[in-house]
Regions:
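Ordered, amphipathic secondary-structure segments that act as subunit-interaction surfaces
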Residues: 114-118
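N-terminal secretory/membrane targeting signals
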Residues: 1-26
Length: 263
């Protein structure tokens, strides 16, 4: 029988300390969820799923070898940061009916770079990944997020902002498919890592394609503003739970597979 390591326990305690004030503050300032408030319900369900995923990833670090612990810990940090922000976003939505744009982009400015770090870490675990891979992924991420934020808060027109954001995303896709990161995975990774890297790439391709749909329905399509806000938040919420938790599960799977193969 395996005993939960003190490191895993400490990680869980730290996560609980981070999440608890957010839950308490959100609960003390919010109204009850209406039975027909599907956006608010989605915020709550996803925040709970993110908390559960955080506990899972932190506990599972004890099952993997040392070179995979950082990757799995980063997966837990992604879901932890997202969970905290989702409690606040839910509170904003339930109280005001407004889109919690600022909280959402603060979340993305932390979690999306961490997701890109996962590509770098998984390559570093199987060889010498260059710093250039890391910085190119960071640059693409920041261009994508800054463009989207500028359009959503009205700093620039929504169409130019959309194009800037899409350009950042395209730059990321180039790096992980055709750039140095993609070539390193194809030429040097074992089959389990290669499969995980490929799945992660398709999440960034297909899973991230959900976000432009939310932006389009929220800001570029004509129609009722209230309905547009609901559609935008539902789409963003579904995209977040898919991309952040699924990403972590892929990392967990390859970490456990590789660790057991070498043990």
């Amino acid at each position: 029988m395996k005993i939960v390591s003190s490191t895993s326990v400490m990680a869980l305690v730290t996560a609980a300390m981070v999440i608890s004030p957010s839950v308490t503050l959100a609960a003390s300032h919010s109204k009850n969820l209406a039975s027909d408030d599907f956006v608010g319900i989605s915020f709550w369900l996803i925040s709970m799923a993110l908390v559960a995923a955080t506990a899972f990833f932190f506990l599972e670090t004890q099952r993997v070898s040392a070179k995979w612990k950082t990757s799995l810990t980063v997966s837990g940090l992604v879901t932890l940061v997202a969970a905290v922000h989702y409690f606040y976003m839910r509170d904003v939505w339930v109280e005001t009916g407004a889109t919690p744009t600022v909280y959402r982009y603060i979340d993305w400015l932390i979690t999306v770079p961490l997701l890109m770090v996962e590509f770098y870490l998984i390559l570093r675990a199987i060889g010498q990944a260059s710093a250039g891979i890391f910085w190119r992924l960071m640059i693409g991420t920041l261009v994508m997020l800054v463009g989207g934020y500028a359009g959503e808060v009205g700093y620039i027109d929504v169409w130019p902002a959309f194009i800037i954001g899409m350009a950042g995303w395209a730059f990321i896709l180039y790096e992980i498919f055709l750039g140095e990161a993609g070539k390193m995975s194809a030429n040097h990774a074992p089959e389990s890592v290669k499969s995980a890297f490929s799945t992660m790439r398709w999440i960034v391709t297909i899973g991230w394609a959900i976000y432009p749909l939310g932006y389009f329905y929220g800001y570029l399509a004509s129609g009722d503003p209230a309905a547009a806000a609901e559609t935008l938040n539902i789409i963003y919420n579904l995209a977040d739970v898919l991309n952040k938790i699924a990403f972590g599960v892929i990392i967990w799977n390859v970490a456990v597979t590789e660790s057991e193969a070498t043990s």
